[in-house]
UniProtKB/Swiss-Prot annotation:
Protein known as: Succinate--CoA ligase [ADP-forming] subunit beta
Pathway: Carbohydrate metabolism; tricarboxylic acid cycle; succinate from succinyl-CoA (ligase route): step 1/1
Organism in which the protein naturally occurs: Paenarthrobacter aurescens (strain TC1)
This protein's UniProt keywords: ATP-binding, Ligase, Magnesium, Metal-binding, Nucleotide-binding, Tricarboxylic acid cycle
Binding of Mg(2+), residues: 191, 205
Residues the record lists as binding substrate: 256, 318-320
SUPFAM superfamilies: Glutathione synthetase ATP-binding domain-like, Succinyl-CoA synthetase domains
Catalytic reaction annotation: succinate + ATP + CoA = succinyl-CoA + ADP + phosphate; GTP + succinate + CoA = succinyl-CoA + GDP + phosphate
Functional summary from the UniProt entry: Succinyl-CoA synthetase functions in the citric acid cycle (TCA), coupling the hydrolysis of succinyl-CoA to the synthesis of either ATP or GTP and thus represents the only step of substrate-level phosphorylation in the TCA. The beta subunit provides nucleotide specificity of the enzyme and binds the substrate succinate, while the binding sites for coenzyme A and phosphate are found in the alpha subunit.
A cellular component annotation (GO) from this entry: cytosol
PROSITE patterns (UniProt xref): ATP_GRASP, SUCCINYL_COA_LIG_3
Length: 389
């Protein structure tokens, strides 16, 4: 889960990272009041989870509260790379002497953590990495050790900080690592990290991405979710503990196990080439549980997508046997009643497959078609979806 800048700022402050005053505002009037409360020069910053805000006109300096009102009026409702600005942060103006860069992230390729640091901040870090890679220090972080004082000192030395700044910057890096570790983040980035005219090191802008797999350890993270931006079907599925991702297609997919579901997406996409180029409408992994309740919840989410024209249920019976899956499907259709109004193609294999097929055959539901293989099921589901387009 990516955080808004104001959320990252608040999280930094909670962990002792030095930040400037910042207040989120949803209306121009709130923005004016925030500017009056902070006092002096402020910056009106669009709150969207995308870069390039400044170039798009989403960041403006306000010398007075009236200017903050004017700028926020123009920024609120603005579209920045497909993201609508619904709120702004009124931030205290900074006396910037130097701009730096720091981030720590999950390095999936090397199964490690990676710290990146540069004395040249304030610009697109991707551009710096390409044009002047020597200006960006990259230090591998052992997950078992993390960033301790010695590692923080190594990072600032590798980045080329002036001797008189190294202690202060290292102290901020240790606190940013505290954010990364204790909040179960996959990214903590500050660009720019600045030295003020008074010689203080301050995090002026921040990005934080949290690992949603660790949500069970962080009940307080729930309030950070952007309810406005979340896809309503994905939000509904999440509330029911379903692993669901909406896609842009017509064939709903239900499977057990991420690998099987991913394979099903590929097979359906391939079959769709012969049937009007229909595509998978979603990823939905019900895992090991295929009870009537889980099936009903899954079908309810999928059938709530108006783009879905057919559903392909592809299950390999293991711990959860095929007869239990079949009973779950029959029970789900009974529970959903008239809202289950799209054809279902069901392919079962594995533990107790014959009993599962018998249950579905005897149920004789008009919407259910049995398929012997995954290829056959994908082809039939694509055919039905194309016919209903």
């Amino acid at each position: 889960m990516d955080l808004f800048e104001y959320q990252a700022r608040d999280m930094f402050e909670a962990h002792g990272v030095p930040v400037l005053a910042g207040i989120v505002a949803h209306t121009p009037e709130e923005a004016k009041a925030a500017a009056e409360k902070i006092g002096g020069v402020t910056v009106v910053k669009a709150q969207v989870k995308v870069g390039g805000r400044g170039k798009a006109g989403g960041v403006k300096v306000a010398k007075t509260a009236e200017e903050a009102l004017e700028h926020s009026t123009n920024i609120l409702g603005m579209d920045i790379k497909g993201h609508t600005v619904n709120k702004v942060m009124i931030a205290q103006g900074a006396d910037i002497a130097e701009e730096f860069y720091f981030s720590v992230l999950l390095d999936r390729a090397n199964r490690n953590y990676l710290a990146m640091c540069s004395v040249e901040g304030g610009m697109e870090i991707e551009q710096l990495a390409v044009e002047r890679p020597e200006a960006l220090a990259k230090i591998a972080i052992d997950p078992a050790v993390g960033i301790d004082q010695a590692k923080a000192d190594e990072i600032v030395a590798a980045a080329g900080f002036a001797e008189e700044l190294r202690g202060k910057v290292a102290d901020v890096i240790l606190k940013l690592w505290d954010v990364f570790k204790k909040e179960d983040a996959t990214l903590v980035e500050v660009n720019p990290l600045v030295r003020t005219g008074a010689g203080e090191i301050v995090a002026l802008d921040g990005k934080v991405s949290l690992d949603e797999n660790a949500d069970f350890r962080h009940v307080h993270h729930a309030h950070l979710e952007d309810k406005d931006a979340a896809d309503p079907l994905e939000a509904k599925a999440k509330a029911q503990d379903l692993n669901y991702v909406k896609l842009d297609g017509e064939v709903g997919i239900i499977g057990n196990g991420a690998g099987l579901v991913m394979s099903t997406l590929d097979v359906v996409a391939y079959a769709g080439e012969n049937h009007g180029n229909v595509k998978p409408a979603n990823f939905l992994d019900i895992g090991g549980g295929a009870s009537a309740e889980v099936m009903a919840n899954g079908l309810d989410v999928i059938l709530g997508d108006s783009q879905v024209k057919s559903v392909f249920v592809n299950v390999f019976g293991g711990i959860t046997a095929c007869d239990a899956v079949a009973k779950g499907i029959v029970g789900a259709l009974a529970e959903l009643g008239s809202s289950a109004n799209k054809p279902l193609v069901v392919r079962l294999d594995g533990n107790n497959v014959e009993e599962g097929r018998r249950i579905l055959t005897e149920a004789n539901h008009p919407l259910v078609t049995l398929a012997a293989t995954m290829d056959e099921g994908a082809d039939k589901a694509a055919e039905l979806a194309n016919a209903a387009k």
